[in-house]
């Protein structure tokens, strides 16, 4: 199935995996709706991509924002073929440090953001009889480690949501979950805990993937034949053990 002519919503599109995915899909002929909070970044990226890109300032933790995003994409493109729920944060910390505000923020962005993204397009996709939901999780959604209990919990939730959606919409909606390992993006900037920051260099002392590696996986999933779906894709740097 060709990506050309597809209409795709991408959240967290202002940088990293989201921006790389937007560029790759647009280069393959897709129409992309870029969603993020940073208007300046969205404008720059849309200008770089050209006429295949539109953008909308969106807070994924707002259900109304996400519903408006879906409606804007449908109005602009006439349809939505796929959504890439990519927005996420990773403020790692030990549970004993009680960074409760960060826990709440992770739940809002990493879990509710995915749910709101699905809700924004699901009725439309079911009415059309086809669609593709791609959720960007993490290898942390397949395990957990010290300091990542809450982050891993949110990513395990994404796995459960994806699997539930797949079973509820089997035969109509394609559902793909991508589990990246270390990727060279801004994700680590959300870590504020001084204990974690002090040891982060030793913990991740290997070369990460480029955002383009994950964008390639998204493109491959969208481009796969209509009668099949890549449900789970795990991508790690060759040196990453966990």
Where are these regions (language model features)?
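C-terminal helical subdomain
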Residues: 177-178, 197-241
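Conserved glycine-rich Rossmann-like NAD(P)H-binding loop of the short-chain dehydrogenase/reductase
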Residues: 28-45
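The beta1-alpha1 cofactor-binding region of Rossmann-like NAD(H)/NADP(H)-dependent oxidoreductases
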Residues: 57-69, 100
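Substrate-binding pocket helix/loop in short-chain dehydrogenase/reductase
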Residues: 94-95, 102-107
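Active-site helix of classical SDR
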Residues: 118, 154
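Conserved glycine-rich cofactor-binding loop
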Residues: 14-15
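Residue(s) in the substrate-gating loop at a strand-loop-helix junction
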Residues: 138
């Amino acid at each position: 199935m060709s990506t050309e002519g597809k209409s795709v919503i991408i959240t967290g599109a202002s940088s990293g995996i989201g921006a790389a995915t937007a560029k790759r899909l647009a280069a393959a002929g897709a129409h992309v709706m870029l969603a993020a909070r940073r208007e300046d970044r969205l404008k720059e990226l849309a200008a770089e991509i050209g006429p295949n890109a539109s953008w909308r300032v969106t807070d994924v933790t707002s259900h109304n924002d996400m519903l408006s995003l879906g409606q804007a994409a449908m109005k602009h493109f006439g349809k939505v073929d796929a959504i890439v729920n990519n927005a996420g944060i990773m403020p790692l910390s030990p549970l004993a440090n009680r960074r409760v505000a960060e826990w709440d923020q992770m739940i809002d962005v990493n879990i509710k953001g995915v749910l709101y993204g699905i809700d924004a397009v699901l009725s439309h996709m079911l009415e059309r009889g086809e669609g593709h939901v791609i959720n960007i999780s993490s290898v942390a959604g397949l395990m957990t480690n010290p300091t990542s209990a809450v982050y891993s919990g949110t990513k395990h939730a994404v796995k459960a949501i994806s699997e539930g959606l797949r079973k509820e919409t089997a035969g109509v909606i394609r559902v793909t979950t991508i589990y990246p390992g270390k990727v060279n993006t801004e994700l680590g900037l959300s870590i504020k805990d001084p204990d974690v920051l002090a040891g982060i260099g030793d913990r991740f002392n290997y070369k990460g993937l480029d955002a383009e590696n994950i964008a390639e996986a998204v493109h491959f999933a969208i481009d796969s034949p209509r009668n099949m779906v890549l449900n789970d894709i795990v991508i790690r740097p060759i040196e990453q053990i966990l």
